[in-house]
Regions:
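Eukaryotic intrinsically disordered and solvent-exposed regulatory patches
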Residues: 1-4, 34-36, 82-85, 108-111
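Active-site-proximal beta-strand elements of phosphoester/diester hydrolases
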Residues: 3, 10-23, 48-50
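Surface polyanion/phosphate-binding segment centered on an Asp-His-Pro turn
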Residues: 4-12, 43, 101-145
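Structured beta-strand/turn binding interfaces of compact recognition modules in eukaryotic regulators
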Residues: 18, 50, 79, 125-127
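Short, solvent-exposed loop/turn segments at secondary-structure junctions
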Residues: 20-22, 54-56, 103-104, 129-131
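A short acidic, often aromatic-flanked loop/helix-cap motif at beta-alpha or helix-coil junctions
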Residues: 24, 84-89, 114-117
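Short coil/turn segments at secondary-structure boundaries
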Residues: 28-31, 60-63, 110-112, 136-139
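Metal-dependent phosphoesterases centered on the DNase I-like endonuclease/exonuclease/phosphatase
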Residues: 29-102
Length: 145
């Protein structure tokens, strides 16, 4: 698993990016993810997760259920409901953006046409009136060949 936490102190929002290889050890990934989420919770950071963990969110599966359960325990929800990758006439949503259910209620997620990658770009715009700012965050998952 590869992850980065990018603090954005001006708007008090951090971005956690996560990548899990398709054939990585899933249980180890879940353990590491929980450790990272617990650390972030202890630091009291507001954050968003952009991920490519190679679990198709369009289909029900054991891995998806386990992953979703971990995120739900931290009050994080999936926002991407459209395919993020199309290959051989098959659609999948292996990339996603997760946000806090209690903090970000007014948001828009939209796809953007792929230009640099085999995945489509997901863009999220979060409207936060109580803080008098809008957070614009674009999550790119780029495969370099």
């Amino acid at each position: 698993m590869q992850s980065n936490l990018i603090p954005h102190t001006h708007k008090h929002l951090s971005l956690l990016t996560i990548y899990r290889a398709p054939f990585g050890k899933f249980n180890k990934f879940l353990t590491q993810l929980e450790e990272i989420l617990q650390t972030i919770r202890n630091l009291k950071l507001d954050f968003i997760i952009c991920e490519d963990i190679n679990i198709n969110h369009l289909n029900e599966s054991s891995k998806r259920s386990q992953f979703d359960a971990v995120l739900m325990s931290y009050k994080l929800i999936s926002t991407v409901t459209f395919p993020t990758r199309t290959e051989n006439n098959s659609n999948s949503t292996t990339d996603n953006i997760f946000i806090y259910t209690f903090m970000f209620e007014n948001y828009t997620v939209s796809p953007s046409i792929k230009r640099l990658s085999d995945h489509n770009v997901q863009m999220i715009i979060i409207h936060i009136p109580q803080r008098q700012l809008d957070v614009h965050l674009t999550c790119y998952n780029i495969l370099l060949i």
